[in-house]
Amino acid sequence: MCPRLGAILVFCVQPLYYLLVMADQKKTRRELLEAFVAQKPDDAFSRYGLAMECVNTGDTSAAERNFRELLQRNADYVPAYLMFAQMLVKELRPDDARQILQQGISAASKAGNDHALSEMEALLSEL
């Protein structure tokens, strides 16, 4: 089998199949994401999705745990820094947000992600 085809099956088809199977069991979006994270704890995209789902449903303590775990496992996952910092600002925790933004600015700079870098610098200047 072609290595690219194998990667497509593992990273695209398998998760979609899993979603369809789980959806048939009437799982919530959060339960589906939790199952993905349990299956692949190092998968940044799944953990980011879970953290964002927790933010969107108001479970900020679970969101914080997932953002911190994500950044511990995948320190180069730049979008997480901005979203985590925005959540902390809404939670009236500007000092914590500053710390996350400073880490995120460093990560975005290393990654060459100028858009995220400018957004994080702008948010940091507002705090």
How should each PLM-predicted stretch be described?
Residues 54, 88, 121-124:
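Residue at a conserved register position within TPR or TPR-like alpha-solenoid repeats
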Residues 39, 73, 107-111:
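Structural marker of alpha-solenoid helical repeat scaffolds
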Residues 35-36, 69-70, 104:
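Canonical positions in the second alpha-helix
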